[in-house]
Amino acid sequence: MFGASGKGLILPECRVFPPSSGISMRITMIGSGYVGLVSGACFADFGHQVICVDKDAEKIEKLELGQMPIYEPGLAELVTNNARHGRLSFTTDLKGSVQGADAVFIAVGTPSRRGDGHADLSYVYAAAREVAEAVNKFMVVITKSTVPVGTGDEVERVMRKTRPDGDFAVVSNPEFLREGAAIRDFKHPDRIVIGTSDARAKAVMQDVYRPLYLNRAPIMVTERRTAELIKYAANAFLATKITFINEVADLAEKVGANVQDVARGIGLDNRIGAKFLHAGPGYGGSCFPKDTLALIKTAQDHQAPLRIVETVAAVNEQRKRAMGRKVLAAAGGDLRDKTVAVLGLTFKPNTDDMRDAPSIPLITALQDMGARVVAYDPEGMEQARLVLNDVTYAADAYACAKGADVLVITTEWEQFRALDFAALKAAMTTPVLVDLRNVYSPEEADRHGFAYTGIGRG
C-alpha cells in the first residue's frame, strides 16, 4: 500500500491483472488526445465512471460515434466497449463534467513554444482555471500532461487565485505510455509515479489505481516536483541511449564492426539492458524531441545546464538530416530525376503519429537532391499529407516500389519484415535497398540480387 510517509514506496510487480475491486471513482479527463483518451478508456475498463472532455466538438462527435482521432492498437475496441457499458462518455462541457468528480486529470497538449523551446503550458493553466471555477467539493486535480518542474506549483497558484475558497489538491502523475503499446503499458506498468504530500490526495489516488495496486504494480509516491522531473529525466535518458547506439553505429561502419552484435553484447549486461539499443535514423515522435528540449531549457533557466542532453538533441537532429546522404551514396551519388520509394512514414510502427518523424527530414532532403518520392505507410499517410509536400502515396509496398531506383525502409512495420524480394526486384528499375532499421541482413538482400545499405554494418 502507499504507506504512512508516502515517499519512495515501491511494490514488487505481479503480471496477473485482477478484476476491479468494486470501488468506482468519478473521473474527468480533460483532453481527449493520445494520453487523455488512452488513460480515460483504461480507467473506465477498471470500472470507474469516466468523462473525457475536449473543446473540439467535432472530435467529441466522432468519439461518440466510435470513431478514433488516433490509431492505437486495441483502443477503438476498448473505447467502444466501455462506452456501451456506460462507463465512458464524452463531452465539451468542462464545468458540468468536473462538478461532482473525485479526480480530474489534465491531459492537454504541452507543445514546444515557438522560438525558445520551452513547453507551452497555456493549455494546462487554462484548464486549471476552468476546473477551479467548477470545484464544488474536495477534488484531486492531477497533471497527466508532461510538464516542467514547478508546473504543479503554478497550477495550484492559478487555481487558488481563481477560487481562494476551493477545496482541492494538485497532484503530479506523469504518463509513461509507448505509442503502439499504450494499453498494455497502462495496465501492466513498469511503475506508477504519484507526486503529492497531501494525505487526502494519496487516498484518492490509491482508489483510482486500486486494480493496479491490488495487482502489486510498482507504485512510487514522492514529492510533486520530483515526480515532474522523473518524467523528463526518463525520456532524456532513453533519448541518450538511442543516440549513443546511433553514434556507435557510425563508428562500426568505419571500423568494420556490426552494431547489432555490439548492441546485443552490451545489452546482455543487466546494468545496461537491451531496450532502446536499436540503431536507426534517429528518434522522433511526440515525446522525446519535445521533452529533451524542454528539459534543456529548464536546466538552463536554473543555471544547471545538462550538457549531455544538449548534445543528444543536437546529434539526433544532425542524424535525421544525414540519412538523405546515405541514400544519395547508395544511389551512386546522384538522385536527380530518380525515384525513391519510402516504406514507413510514422516515427515508429503501430501508430499514425508523424510528429518529428525521421521520414520528414529524409524526404525533404531527397527532394532537395532532385529525387521524386513515392511513399507507403500502413497507418500514417493521412497525417503525412499534412506535413509533406509533393509526395506520391502508394496503395502498398509493391506499388510503392514500382519504377523506383532506390527503396528505403524508414519505419519497421511488421509487414515490412517479410517482403517478397522477387516481386520488389521485378517492380523496381534498379534493385537498391537502403534499410534504415536493419530489418534485413546484407546476406539476405544480396541473395536476392539487391545492393544493400544498412546502419552500423562495416
Question: Which residues does each predicted region cover?
Answer:
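Residue-identity detector for glycine
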Residues: G3-G8, G22
